[in-house]
């Protein structure tokens, strides 16, 4: 099969009335799309590409797991000293994009990013499996790795000890507060359906418009 034959190969039969009758609240629709992706057993439904920018305007992106999505925004975690953490400290705005190949849906959320307080970050850390907590405790994300075996051994020792693992002070939660949301549904004929919402800071109110493919 050619690469061309593998593109836009998902479900083209979804009924998505929001494109014809857009609701006023894009965040409720955002949660509906996320819940539907989970219900349809999409692979990695909460995996998203986070794009950040540094002070020189250089963009970087990476796939991560979104922990929660509600009316206040989207939660994710990172080390403050990582590339994304440094970017967000200097330019606290970002974009998260979900793509679900099985259903030909893409959801993009943009907006300012705020750092969660210690209590909220502790709660997020406590939800992680012990193995993930141990790796987080011994790692300094994005720093130079000199000895992989030694790093793994330190993480394994924490797991085997079975004691509670404390959240590293540098590991924190973030919330992306949406001020723009775009819903996209792909079509093999490239007549993709697009619905964009914007919430300007001056008004604080959502507006929406359909976009050409």
Question: What is the meaning of each model-derived region?
Answer:
Residues 1-213:
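Binding-site signature for planar aromatic cofactors or substrates
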